Structures are given as C-alpha cells and as structure tokens.
C-alpha cells in the first residue's frame, strides 16, 4: 500500500476551469457506452473517423479461394499495414499471432457454403468467445429479400443484444444472394434495416448511381465491401467515390490480396481513405510502391 507518512494535500484543483467532456464524433455513435466507443475508436481512426479493414474471412463459406490458400504466407505480411483485421475465430486462433496487436472484427455468422443457399446462416460464435479473443466487433450477414431473410435479421438482433451486454459492436453485412438486386434502392433498404435493428456499423456495396442516398439514409457508419477483383485503378476509383459520397471506410479482401502488389495496394487504399488522395494519384502511388517492393 502507499506510504501513509508522506501524504500531501491536493492544491491544484483548477478552480474556475470547467471540466469538459470530449464528444465521440463517429456517426450515430455518440450515445454508446464507453467500452463500445473505445472499441469503435480502435476500428475507426479517431482523426479521420474512417477505417481500412482487411477482409480475409471468405473461407467460412468459400474454402481456400485464390489468395487465401495459405493465410500465413499471403495475408500475414499485410497485417502491419492495415487498420483492422476481419476474419473467423478459426483463422484468428490458428494463424494470427496475438502480438499482431491489431483490432479484430470477428466473423460471427456461418453455417452455409457456396454449394447451397447463401442466406441460410446462423450465429456461429458465442459472445463470450468473442470476449476471450479480445475482438473489437462481431460481424454477420443480413440477407434482405432472401429465402432466409427473417433468420438473418434475427441473427443480427441476437448479436446486437449480446454485444450490448458486453460492449461489443455489431457490424451488419448486407449480403447479396445469387438472384438479388444490386442497386441503391436495395442497399438503402438493407442498410437501414440493419441499423434500425441496432447494428453499430453497416458494411454494404458501392453502386454507381445513388450511393450518396445509401450513406445519407443510414444513421450509422457505412464501410464498403471490395467485392470482386477489379483492375487496381478501378478499385481505387471505387474507394475514392465511396468516401466522397459518405462512406466511413472500406473492408477489402480480393482487391488487395489478389492484386499483383498486395502491400502496395493496401497502402494506396489507405492514402485514399485517410488522406483523400485522388484515385489517379493513388494509382500512381501504387505503381511506384510496386516497383520499390520489386513486385
């Protein structure tokens, strides 16, 4: 215990200087509990209120797809440069070194595969296990308009309720099935429903027309999915336009780890997201980094 012989009375109480409260300015998150805000502040850069997430959770329904055959060889070299890791608990425990010390968004839905109905998912992780893994958020798909729409919405509700008990945010991912639309009207509907159910963050797709309506009508931060592999200049253009139209970040997988220069691509995406670099400048940056890395 402290030495009781040398206790000095306090003198500097700042009389006349009111105590100020620092507001948490991430969209729609100002009234969340301290622990949840703290976790979100690790995901979203407090200076830009934006994030670059590296998604490599595809194996939970796709198996060892191109670029993810060996996480330890292809993805681990990218850990240091990304803001956030998005993966499953199996990969986290088996392949991600704890000393990586990056915030994790944990894939918490599953039970489906590319061989069956994609929307037929369940909650695949108990919140207590997410706590053991020290993650900053959990993620699940929501399939609006699908055969298992109600089930997927209920998955989000379960995660939100459990997350609220422990201070862990839920990221709802607007899944798109084989026959489902990919337009602003659909993604506005899906994103708004996810937010109304209590998701603190929504991941959705960028669309060429009306994306600003998707972000404006969603009361919480939206991060865009990278989607299918695009040429690097197109992927960077998509990033720039999404940020310019209100997105709070990107959650990219294939457009990074399937790039001919993944590390350079990740750095270029961060330039766009956090520094508002234009797509043209970012593509030039990628080319220079690619040459510098000998890729």
From Swiss-Prot:
Catalysed reactions, as listed in the record: dihydroxyacetone phosphate + acetyl-CoA = 3-hydroxy-2,4-dioxopentyl phosphate + CoA
Enzyme class: transferase
Locations listed in the record: Cytoplasm
Domain of life according to the entry: Bacteria
GO cellular component: cytoplasm
Pfam families named in the record: DeoC (PF01791)
SUPFAM superfamilies, sorted: Aldolase
Entry EC number(s): 2.3.1.245
GO molecular function terms listed in the Swiss-Prot or TrEMBL record: acyltransferase activity, transferring groups other than amino-acyl groups; fructose-bisphosphate aldolase activity
Keywords tagged on the record: Cytoplasm, Schiff base, Transferase
Main location: cytoplasm
Catalytic residue list: 203 (schiff-base intermediate with substrate)
Keyword Coiled coil attached: no
Quaternary structure (record): Homodecamer.
Its biological purpose: Involved in the degradation of phospho-AI-2, thereby terminating induction of the lsr operon and closing the AI-2 signaling cycle. Catalyzes the transfer of an acetyl moiety from 3-hydroxy-5-phosphonooxypentane-2,4-dione to CoA to form glycerone phosphate and acetyl-CoA.
Protein family membership: Belongs to the DeoC/FbaB aldolase family.
Name this protein carries in UniProt: 3-hydroxy-5-phosphonooxypentane-2,4-dione thiolase
Gene name of this polypeptide: lsrF
């Amino acid at each position: 215990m402290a030495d009781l012989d040398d206790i000095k009375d306090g003198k500097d109480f700042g009389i006349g200087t009111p105590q100020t409260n620092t507001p948490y300015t991430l969209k729609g998150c100002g009234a969340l509990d301290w622990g949840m805000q703290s976790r979100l502040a690790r995901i979203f850069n407090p200076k830009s209120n934006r994030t670059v997430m590296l998604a490599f959770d595809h194996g939970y329904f796709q198996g060892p797809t191109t670029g993810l055959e060996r996480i330890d060889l292809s993805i681990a070299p990218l850990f240091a440069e990304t803001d956030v890791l998005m993966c499953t608990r199996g990969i986290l425990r088996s392949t991600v070194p704890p000393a990586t010390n990056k915030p994790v968004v944990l894939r918490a839905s599953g039970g489906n595969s590319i061989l069956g109905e994609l929307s037929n998912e369940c909650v695949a992780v108990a919140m207590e296990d997410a706590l053991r893994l020290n993650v900053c958020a959990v993620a699940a798909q929501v399939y609006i308009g699908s055969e298992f729409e109600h089930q997927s919405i209920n998955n989000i509700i379960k995660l939100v309720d459990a997350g609220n008990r422990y201070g862990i945010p839920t990221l709802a991912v607007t899944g798109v099935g084989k026959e489902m639309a990919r337009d602003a009207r659909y993604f506005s509907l899906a994103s708004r429903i996810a937010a109304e159910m209590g998701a603190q963050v929504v991941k959705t797709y960028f669309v060429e027309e009306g994306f600003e309506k998707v972000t404006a009508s969603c009361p919480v931060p939206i991060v865009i999915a990278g989607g299918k592999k695009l040429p690097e200049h197109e992927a960077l253009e998509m990033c720039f336009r999404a940020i310019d139209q209100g997105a709070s970040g990107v959650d990219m997988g294939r457009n990074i780890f399937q790039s001919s220069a993944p590390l350079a691509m990740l750095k270029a995406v961060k330039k766009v997201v956090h520094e508002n670099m234009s797509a043209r400048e970012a593509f030039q940056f990628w080319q220079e980094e690619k040459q510098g890395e000998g890729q």
